[in-house]
Amino acid sequence: MQYLNIKEDCNAMAFCAKMRSSKKTEVNLEAPEPGVEVIFYLSDREPLRLGSGEYTAEELCIRAAQACRISPLCHNLFALYDENTKLWYAPNRTITVDDKMSLRLHYRMRFYFTNWHGTNDNEQSVWRHSPKKQKNGYEKKKIPDATPLLDASSLEYLFAQGQYDLVKCLAPIRDPKTEQDGHDIENECLGMAVLAISHYAMMKKMQLPELPKDISYKRYIPETLNKSIRQRNLLTRMRINNVFKDFLKEFNNKTICDSSVSTHDLKVKYLATLETLTKHYGAEIFETSMLLISSENEMNWFHSNDGGNVLYYEVMVTGNLGIQWRHKPNVVSVEKEKNKLKRKKLENKHKKDEEKNKIREEWNNFSYFPEITHIVIKESVVSINKQDNKKMELKLSSHEEALSFVSLVDGYFRLTADAHHYLCTDVAPPLIVHNIQNGCHGPICTEYAINKLRQEGSEEGMYVLRWSCTDFDNILMTVTCFEKSEQVQGAQKQFKNFQIEVQKGRYSLHGSDRSFPSLGDLMSHLKKQILRTDNISFMLKRCCQPKPREISNLLVATKKAQEWQPVYPMSQLSFDRILKKDLVQGEHLGRGTRTHIYSGTLMDYKDDEGTSEEKKIKVILKVLDPSHRDISLAFFEAASMMRQVSHKHIVYLYGVCVRDVENIMVEEFVEGGPLDLFMHRKSDVLTTPWKFKVAKQLASALSYLEDKDLVHGNVCTKNLLLAREGIDSECGPFIKLSDPGIPITVLSRQECIERIPWIAPECVEDSKNLSVAADKWSFGTTLWEICYNGEIPLKDKTLIEKERFYESRCRPVTPSCKELADLMTRCMNYDPNQRPFFRAIMRDINKLEEQNPDIVSEKKPATEVDPTHFEKRFLKRIRDLGEGHFGKVELCRYDPEGDNTGEQVAVKSLKPESGGNHIADLKKEIEILRNLYHENIVKYKGICTEDGGNGIKLIMEFLPSGSLKEYLPKNKNKINLKQQLKYAVQICKGMDYLGSRQYVHRDLAARNVLVESEHQVKIGDFGLTKAIETDKEYYTVKDDRDSPVFWYAPECLMQSKFYIASDVWSFGVTLHELLTYCDSDSSPMALFLKMIGPTHGQMTVTRLVNTLKEGKRLPCPPNCPDEVYQLMRKCWEFQPSNRTSFQNLIEGFEALLK
């Protein structure tokens, strides 16, 4: 983009603002007619007149934009202004129109950025982000390929508005510093008239002599200057008039005709000049007599009296510099004096007055928009909260002025920081609220939509919703789809756009006759359909929603905005190294996940003026357990993350020390210790405001991390440390978020399950899903803890029940306060993309705090939803899976929704003729299973009761491949020795876990090992499993109703005693089955019967025992390596104490697999 650089005798040209043309462009300021009118500054636009009804200011702005051809992209630069009250309307303000009301509003560009045109070399240019510029960052030079801020229609409107503002003195001329400066300003104003008249002539395609006689410079200069000229003598007025005509003619001949200057160039030049000619052009200044700048530890009030006179302060908001404040300066006038001596004295006096007021007149920076987290309005008092917990409070003249002020800051925030967020609910634009609820973007361009799809994986059916850049009544849906081509092997990825039409509040897909009352309803309908276009068919899957501070063409790139762009985490580890000689280890404080916690002292040596001073700093030492040195890298990654942050509510990391085999994280010592313990101790004295302060401080820290795109990964009350109790003081509590410890990416699945419900559900499925969204889930759970005084949610649940809790998409029971419950529910959404941004969380917590809900009396959480209880009416039988003497197992679908989408489960129940003993056995089996959690043990899902609780069914996961006994013969060609040994390792791991919990299985056989996949097996059927008493090494069976004797160890057959070593014997038999592919001719029963001969009843057991005493064992299976058979034989030692262990077997098999 190129702009004109005009050099003229009139030294008045160089900046930006707003203009008018001809008599027709003058806005009628007579008393308004009844009704509501929206006035435009364009000469060819009739005012927008509204009929009876209810409208929002945003609605009217859209209508006005359509009337003036302003694009949806530039529409958010405009707002409605009431010249009578001198107030702007917030976008959500409701206007009720009836016959009695009379209101005139002006449609104006409100949000302005100086040097948007790039013609001022002394100031950084301003542009819209474009896909090309996104990677390059901010450049000091002009960017020829950057996207301009304004479109043609917006520029035209701004030009007309600028003329009006200059003439009507809405944009006041800057104050002259000297008399000569006053003359220069007058010349600049005449130069503006030259530009305006030249533009008018070019638009009308007229030569200067052809212009109407009433087109005079007087109509294009400020009314105050025009009045001043009229008061001068006739000769002076004639001289000004002749000089202006000569200059206009010369400008036309030398510049307009010779340089091929366009009307666009003249508009840009006029507006650029307006920026330097006027005072604070594009800025809004608010006056207050009460101003407070504060942080959590200090306050600075500015509302004192000066000798009985109230001191006023000014707060200025500009697009380029953000929010600034100062004392309101005294007005210093320049008096005209012909006498040179007296004039010099006056100028000296003026300089002295200027120096006196210099300090008062200087603007102090408070904040640029991306720093702001939320804004609160209470009547006429506005509180602006920053990320560093500093706050500005100012009292304005009315609630309406407060809304006007906040809507200004909120609008600039969306233009510079985050296009899809609002800072204050009181001024929330309805369209932004709609977009957030529906995951819809503003009018981002196609390139950004496609880039977003690519960044999120470009899976088929993934889509982006976005408003059209050109039409207010259309939403575009950009979808990833794949076109299969006969010419090209495989499918070609394509991005297709679909148009959604919005008419009279209803939504429909272009080309479809069916419409819906909301965008959400339409999308729900479309997701069930197969969409077709250009020989491509697909189904919609996942919507890519707006993300916090996402870069797009909706954002304006100013110098300050670029400074606040997220700095993404360093790819390399970075932290300060601490020497071991500088650390003194203190007492042991406890254990973390794979770490030991100690108090300690850090010796800090400072060289002050040649003298070395030793300072002792109290610290916490987190020592990685030397047995887990394999995860040292993950430990250092956590330290590196903490090294990148600096926030008052996050614990400070001094550095890392490597001491011999120990890796140590050295952190700030926080006096009050973990928050959960403190809340338990002080639960009786904790108040609602106290809890809200804790929640806000945590949200502030997490919002800071979100802005830096950093993930904590372990947010909970035990990781919140209390630096100040704040129960008896006005300051309140002060908390610090500690380090996350070992990242979940290196934790076992069991360790992840233990962290339910703090860990996000998607991270349980795959720890690689860890993202900022996971911290939002954790925040919701931590908010629950804070509400209930540090109570532990799901504390009585077993691991299997916790896992089921997530599988059933449950949440902890929320408090009775509806708004607080809603916030927790939104944070704990099972769709990570639906969780709110932390800025929105902070805003909502502050809004909720105003209501002061009672969250203290909720002493104990209500009963949790039990996801392990299955209702009988939703169990739909599919087929039988197996049957025994007393029970059976069925395949069922648990389908509470009634749409055949429920999960398939295995249901074990007793036959009707079974007696009370069998019911007790099934209950014992259920109790055992619900306490077991291992990847190689079949999962317990719950129970189903019937007959008033007398009947019971056991619900387990269904593994469709069946048992090894069924699976191996059918898949013999796919299963080699290596895979057989892997199965053996998995069975041993499951049995080793079972033994560690003091259980004996008593029925380990191939028929009871189930196949989850080609690569994983699980131990099932715990009907005979028994618990060994703590003071014994074995379990004695009272009966042998259905004992699998050919898998039993000798002590089981002779004495009915079952040791863990007895399961080892059974494993050896199972391994034999595994290596013979469960061939019926080679089954343990078939082979043992060949050894002992025909027999039946108790004689079978007697002969089997004698055979085993003789040292006879099952033979080596065909093609079984001797090393494997030797491991098998170690399982069959006659004495239990001589047998190998499951741990030794695991090591032996793994050595063979290497």
Swiss-Prot record:
What is written in the cofactor note of this entry?
A: Mn(2+) was used in the in vitro kinase assay but Mg(2+) is likely to be the in vivo cofactor.
PTM comment: the record says: Autophosphorylated. Phosphorylated by TYK2 on tyrosine residues in response to type-I interferon signaling, leading to its activation. Phosphorylated on tyrosine residues in response to interferon gamma signaling. Dephosphorylation of Tyr-1034 and Tyr-1035 by PTPN2 negatively regulates cytokine-mediated signaling.
Instruction: Using the record's annotations, give every residue carrying the modification Phosphotyrosine.
Output: Y3, Y1034, Y1035
**What does altering K908A do?**
Loss of protein tyrosine kinase activity
Q: Where are the N-acetylmethionine residues found in this chain?
A: M1
According to its UniProt record, which residues of this chain constitute the active site? D1003
Localization annotation: Endomembrane system
GO biological-process terms attached to the record: cell differentiation; cell surface receptor signaling pathway via JAK-STAT; cellular response to virus; cytokine-mediated signaling pathway; growth hormone receptor signaling pathway via JAK-STAT; interleukin-10-mediated signaling pathway; interleukin-11-mediated signaling pathway; interleukin-15-mediated signaling pathway
Protein kinase domain: residues covered: 583-855, 875-1153
Q: EC top class, in one word?
A: transferase
A single GO CC term, please?
extrinsic component of cytoplasmic side of plasma membrane
| UniProt-recorded Gene Ontology molecular function terms | ATP binding; CCR5 chemokine receptor binding; growth hormone receptor binding; metal ion binding; non-membrane spanning protein tyrosine kinase activity; protein phosphatase binding; protein tyrosine kinase activity; ubiquitin protein ligase binding
Which positions are annotated as binding ATP?
A: L881, G882, E883, G884, H885, F886, G887, K888, V889, K908
Q: Which residues carry this modification: Phosphoserine?
A: S228
Principal location listed in the UniProt entry: membrane
Function noted in UniProt: Tyrosine kinase of the non-receptor type, involved in the IFN-alpha/beta/gamma signal pathway. Kinase partner for the interleukin (IL)-2 receptor as well as interleukin (IL)-10 receptor. Kinase partner for the type I interferon receptor IFNAR2. In response to interferon-binding to IFNAR1-IFNAR2 heterodimer, phosphorylates and activates its binding partner IFNAR2, creating docking sites for STAT proteins. Directly phosphorylates STAT proteins but also activates STAT signaling through the transactivation of other JAK kinases associated with signaling receptors.
Query: What is the protein named?
Result: Tyrosine-protein kinase JAK1
Species classification = Eukaryota, Metazoa, Chordata, Craniata, Vertebrata
